[in-house]
Amino acid sequence: AFPASAAGDEGFTIDFETNCNAIFMKNLDTGTVVFTKNADERIEPASTTKILTYIVVSENVEDLDGTTVTLTQELKDSLEGTGSSIANIMVGETMSIYEALNCLMVPSGNDAAVILADYVGGRKNQETGNPEKLSNIDRFVQMMNDKAAELGCTGTHFANPDGLHDENHYTTARDM
């Protein structure tokens, strides 16, 4: 006998201890759920948020090399005092979306996250006329939540593009 959460559909025993708070393991070849531990409990996604930021940006910018973004003082100030991981992008620095995506993923740059979210959210606000009067970043976060739902995430809600703590920013191991 073993806990139901440790049993796969094929009835085998998982023989290991875990130190993490939540796990969801699934055999992608068979669809068999192999192991779960608090798989549906809310957890903070932290910097794994940037995976969805990357996806939303890459799906909404056609020319990643030819499209550029620039860090503004306002965007830099939005990260002040947060203890953010940054890519050390300087105010006024212009780079391609491709370069900004690298700054987002390699050093986990929150400065890159807000630049990208501001750009993509701003373009979406222009396309829609922004009837809800959302900020560019709030529009981008709405796009992230729409994408998460499209991917089948039912226990996930994003509040920002960078993963900084917010009560309304959460996911589950099953969704991740």
Question: What is the predicted role of each segment?
Answer:
Residues 1-5:
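C-terminal segment of classical bacterial N-terminal signal peptides
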